[in-house]
Design a protein with these regions (language model features):
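Bacterial N-terminal signal peptides
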Residues: 1-6
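OB-fold and OB-like single-stranded nucleic-acid-recognition modules
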Residues: 10-164
Length: 164
C-alpha cells in the first residue's frame, strides 16, 4: 500500500497552458462539471437577478461535509439563480483546471465572509475572463500546474459593483 501511494505522490501534476484569456490547453476540470457547463442564459428580466454581498452568500447553507463533489454533482437551489455580486477584490488566482477564481469580501469590510467567484473556461465566459485578465499584469501564454496568484495592475478596481 505504501509503495502505491508513494508512486502516485511522485506523479507530475498535469499542466494547463493559458494561451489567451479565453483559451486554455490541457485544462482538466472535473468537479461539478454539470454546473460549469450549464448553458442557461442570463435572464433578460433584470428583476430576476438578485443583488447580494459576499457575507450574505457566506451565510448560506452549503452542500454539507458529507457530499462528494463529482463531475455529476447537481447544482443547489441557490446555484440555479443569477446574482449581481458586489464586493472588494481580495485575490485573483488561476487554477490548474483553467478556471479563474476571484476572492471577494464585503466592500465595507464590516462583515465576516469571503467567497470565491469562479469563472470557467468556455465561450460563454470569455468576455468576463477578458475583463478580469485586463485588471492584471499577466502576459500570455503561461503555464501552471497548481493554483497561481495573478498580480493585479495598479489601475485594477478594488471593488466590483454589479448594478444589474
Amino acid at each position: 500500500m505504501f509503495l502505491v501511494a508513494s508512486a502516485f505522490a511522485n506523479s507530475p501534476a498535469p499542466e494547463v497552458t493559458f494561451v489567451s484569456p479565453c483559451e486554455c490547453i490541457g485544462f482538466h476540470g472535473k468537479n461539478r462539471w454539470v454546473t460549469k457547463t450549464d448553458l442557461t442564459p442570463v435572464p433578460s428580466d433584470k428583476a430576476a437577478i438578485q443583488s447580494v454581498t459576499p457575507s450574505q452568500i457566506y451565510a448560506w447553507e452549503g452542500l454539507g461535509p458529507d457530499v462528494e463533489l463529482t463531475a455529476m454533482t447537481e447544482r443547489m437551489p441557490s446555484e440555479q439563480k443569477w446574482y449581481a455580486l458586489t464586493g472588494r477584490i481580495i485575490d485573483v488566482k488561476v487554477e490548474a483546471d483553467g478556471d479563474i477564481h476571484i476572492a471577494l469580501s464585503d466592500a465595507t469590510g464590516n462583515n465576516v465572509g469571503t467567497v470565491s467567484a469562479e469563472i470557467p473556461v468556455g465561450l460563454k465566459w470569455c468576455e468576463i475572463r477578458q475583463t478580469v485578465f485586463g485588471w492584471t499584469t499577466q502576459k500570455f501564454p503561461f503555464t501552471v500546474k497548481t493554483a497561481h496568484t495573478i498580480k493585479m495592475s495598479k489601475s485594477a478596481p478594488q471593488t466590483i459593483v454589479n448594478n444589474q
